[in-house]
């Protein structure tokens, strides 16, 4: 939301014949703005209101270009850009930027007021679900939003299945690192997947991951995962028994995704296209898992009538072992 105050309508001069009451021509603010938009000015002050937790340094980085505006039109553009950046942090319910004339003792100056309403600090979610393997699970997640004032988000998630499956995740999301349009998400996790019903094995993965998400459709991810595969039933296939034990995976992946769905869960319209490439074996340990994997996925949803939705998806992929794994 932007408010722009340029000037008040000028009063009628004594020698000017006034128009009959009820027929006054409305003052054309847009025409007045076109005449003065390139007029030189300086920014007298920038005031921030409603910043209860957010650090002043965050506003200083975002609003610094506003101070450098030299014309009214440039000031308008800088304020619109600052408004968009502040909203992109996703820590405010509302961001209002208002421009007004500076004090009379400083002619040709402007003052800017930024008023924000911060989102709640704590969020709590929970639910019960059934996985594709038919295992019921309970999920609880707790989130802290901008608790330290750096626009950070801290999420803790617990998922426990009624069998052996479980997942524990601690995620730290830092938006606009270095004041550029790049979010960095760091995760530490432990995940136990129980596949005894289908493949007679359990998989435990512990590790960390760092994901860089830009303003476009591409993401880059690095993960370091310690994996253990066990056969508690002693009924696993030969190919599974060949993978039993511990392994270390250090990988870099690149994902390009275009998501035009109306919503991510049970979409009713739109499509999703995703391409992902992963290179495992990044590091100094020769015993690490090494492979090159490519995946492509597409989803489409269409609702021809109310209550009727057609959904189609397809996924293909290929993996090529590298190093010692390619010889085995």
PLM region descriptions:
Residues 2-74, 99-145, 179-183, 271:
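Periplasmic POTRA and POTRA-like interaction domains that precede
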Residues 6, 213, 304:
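Basic phosphate/pyrophosphate-binding loop/patch that engages nucleotide-derived ligands
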Residues 53-54, 68-69, 121-123, 148-149, ...:
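Short beta-strands and strand-coil junctions in structured, solvent-facing domains, enriched
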Residues 63-65, 190-192, 277-281:
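Short, histidine-centered active-site or binding-site loop motifs used for metal coordination
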Residues 79, 85-98, 104-267, 271-274:
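Gram-negative/organellar outer-membrane beta-barrel architecture
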Residues 238-245, 249-328:
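C-terminal outer-membrane beta-barrel translocator/porin domains of Gram-negative envelope proteins
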């Amino acid at each position: 939301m932007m408010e722009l105050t340029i000037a008040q309508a000028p009063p009628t001069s004594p020698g000017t014949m006034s128009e009959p009451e009820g027929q006054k021509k409305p003052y054309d603010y847009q025409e007045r703005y076109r005449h003065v938009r390139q007029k030189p000015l300086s920014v007298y002050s920038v005031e921030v209101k409603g910043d209860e937790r957010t650090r002043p340094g965050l506003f200083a980085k975002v609003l610094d270009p506003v101070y450098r505006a030299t014309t009214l039109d440039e000031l308008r553009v800088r304020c619109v850009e600052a408004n968009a950046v502040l909203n992109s942090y996703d820590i405010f319910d509302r961001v209002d930027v208002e421009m007004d004339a500076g004090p009379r003792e400083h002619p040709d100056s402007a003052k800017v007021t930024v008023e924000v309403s911060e989102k709640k600090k704590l969020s709590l979610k929970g639910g019960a679900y059934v996985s594709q393997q038919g295992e019921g699970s309970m999920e609880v997640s707790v989130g802290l939003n901008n608790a330290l004032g750096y626009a950070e988000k801290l999420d803790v998630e617990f998922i426990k299945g009624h069998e052996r499956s479980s997942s524990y995740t601690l995620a730290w999301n830092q938006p606009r690192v270095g004041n550029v349009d790049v979010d960095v998400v760091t995760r530490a996790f432990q995940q136990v997947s129980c596949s005894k019903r289908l493949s007679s094995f359990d998989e435990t993965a512990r590790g960390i991951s760092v994901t860089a998400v830009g303003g476009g459709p591409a993401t880059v991810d690095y993960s370091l995962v310690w994996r253990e595969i066990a056969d508690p039933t002693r009924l696993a296939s030969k190919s599974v028994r060949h993978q039993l034990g511990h392994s270390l995976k250090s990988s870099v992946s690149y994902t390009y995704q275009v998501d035009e769905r109306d919503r991510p869960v049970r979409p009713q319209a739109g499509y999703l296209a995703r391409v992902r490439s992963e290179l495992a074996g990044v590091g100094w340990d020769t015993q690490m898992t090494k492979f090159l994997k490519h995946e492509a996925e597409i989803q489409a949803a269409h609702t021809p009538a109310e209550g009727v939705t057609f959904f189609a998806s397809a996924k293909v992929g290929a993996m090529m072992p590298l190093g010692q794994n390619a010889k085995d």
